[in-house]
């Protein structure tokens, strides 16, 4: 079973590390090509392209400039411990033990605009380059064209290595668009999290993102390998709704708190 999640905009390079183990990202040659493109942008251009403040644009221009492909624990951090958004609040990787990291390294993948695919212990230098950004590059007009089949091929390699054919899509639409489902050698399962609001169940972005992290943690902690095991997910008040679920879309609901 392979879990896919999105990265986060918020990064943490200060907190104590939960593990000193690390691996190197596998697609750095491609990342380097994107960095070369990004370095051609001025801070105002970055601000317009990403829709961010001048201060953030300056920070990211500096990050692009400082980025270099020789990653060490001194200039980089394990991806699963560097990302700090809503998904990662639910995941709480900083509390993983060695066995959790082992399982996650085999069964969890983070999709990334700059790095393509990251394993949890892959070192990562700080960046901001969302998958949906229209950064022109030698392969096309945006990052989807840049990555082409590369991300899908990497995921197929991971599936081959673990010997099963199930992908649990907990990534956002923006990021999952970088995967080509027809070329993915797997059964695709998408958990959906609905929260009750004024008597109606709907996707509430903040809660849904955190729930994706909670589900990822649930799979990792319990070493789940079969799709039917996912329906037991009951963290923070969610319950499986069999009636509205299908074979490839599992619906979890939570009553208003």
Curated annotation (Swiss-Prot):
Q: Name one GO biological process term.
A: response to hydroperoxide
Q: Which domain of life is it from?
A: Bacteria
Q: Name one GO cellular component term.
A: cytosol
* InterPro entries the UniProt entry points to: YaaA
Protein name per the record: UPF0246 protein YaaA
A Pfam family recorded for this sequence: H2O2_YaaD
Coiled-coil region(s) = none
Q: List the disulfide bonds.
A: none
Family from the record: Belongs to the UPF0246 family.
